[in-house]
């Protein structure tokens, strides 16, 4: 019952000739040579719709948008005569088969969606029952292709959907019911029509039947990578047809004319395989073009030997493999690069480049493909820290990831270290990490203060105030600061929370808990200038002016002393 209602509702809809969408009768306009919807008329303009309809009709005729079985069915007018077939159509027209009388009639008639007759019969789901769910055999699928080689992806409909919704809709989710030979050649050559004419001409000259040329043309044009594996296997089974029809290849596909392709074929033949059975031959067009370009630009030998012998070298050289296990995978790359020296460089320069005397294995030294200039990489390496510390190793991004440092923290670190002496203006902005919510991440400005302090102070004697923890280099993030030594208040020596304390922007070892900070502010007088809670007037970085708390910071610190009375539950 529901299916009958759906079919009845679908039968009332009419497809627009221009936009090809199913419309209700009240949305259609019948004042022109073809039924068009109001949306197309409004978009094109009533004065131009007829011209657009004629243009669309010519395009549909030229590109063969309606293969067999897709034209409207029903009573055909007696006056509608089939158009004269060209020589190309005669060559490529298959012999009639049993059970395909309807298909022959559909092919013979004009490729119009709607005959210019008053009796337009609705197309129901039963019209497609002969071709719906069953996958056609190879020969029938090839015969249903139009003459000029352009294939329609959804030549089949699904019975569970309203039939009017199946009219030439470019919906990709219906492609699974289509044989792989009917998938549109998206990445194929741009001159499909020309190649089809070349096939017809070649068939006419050589005397071969037209149907013999059409499967070869289908196999010659490479399909995109999204086509199922059955299509790739089908191509691999037709190497002889590819070699027999060289005229079908477009200029973009002519690998055989290049010297690199002949070398590839010779190399494959030396391994005991036919040239047409090479791996590169069954790849999509974009992959083949890329491989050929790499082969032409790499002068160290045939590219296939590089791919087969040293996959790690090519992967790291051309793609800059930024692996998660940093040093492990890159050491293997360095070993292969050291084994094979294609250029007469001294032995010491073959390995990974050294920066600041340390080996950087994450920079590849492959000499083919993508070369890395060593001079720009100096901008990624920060100067060594001025303070000696057990944590003074400079971590480059892969190694820092092993140490638990996030890539964003590494980027911030590189930007800070490359900046030089720009911290003086930052130091006047925020002087403490006075956040009430300890679970929130530290603000960037406070992180900069805690990170910039030790680098800029450098040689200052920070032990004068009895600093209880060593000065950490700027390369370590806040998490490693907290993990290396417990944070203690400089005054009361109590354990500090990771993010909930007051940090002196000048002296890194000056860290104060909130009770000590409140007491210091009250002692100094909150109305005037309030300096470092240590009692010293710590100068700003790069100047002799002592820093002082801003009023907002004083209010934040003192706000923790106020206890809010809870309301009684009423």
Curated annotation (Swiss-Prot):
It is found in: Cytoplasm; Nucleus. Residues 232-245, 274-283 have a biased composition (Basic and acidic residues). One of its GO terms (molecular function) is transcription corepressor activity. Phosphorylation at Ser-343 is required for nuclear targeting. The modification N-acetylalanine is found at residue 2. Pfam families: IRF-2BP1_2, IRF-2BP1_2_M, zf-C3HC4_IRF-2BP1_2. Residues 132-147, 254-268 have a biased composition (Low complexity). Residues 66-85, 130-179, 213-283, 330-403, 419-477 are annotated as: Disordered. The modification Phosphoserine is found at residues 71, 169, 226, 250, 300, 343, 389, 406, 438, 440, 443. Keywords: Acetylation, Activator, Cytoplasm, Isopeptide bond, Metal-binding, Nucleus, Phosphoprotein, Repressor, Transcription, Transcription regulation, Ubl conjugation, Zinc, Zinc-finger. There is a cross-link at residues 271, 285, 306, 308, 331 (Glycyl lysine isopeptide (Lys-Gly) (interchain with G-Cter in SUMO2)). GO terms for biological process: immature B cell differentiation; negative regulation of transcription by RNA polymerase II. Belongs to the IRF2BP family. PANTHER family: INTERFERON REGULATORY FACTOR 2-BINDING PROTEIN 2, MYELIN TRANSCRIPTION FACTOR 1-RELATED. Interacts with IRF2. Part of a corepressor complex containing IRF2 and IRF2BP1. Interacts with VGLL4. The C-terminal RING-type zinc finger domain is sufficient for interaction with IRF2. This is Interferon regulatory factor 2-binding protein 2.
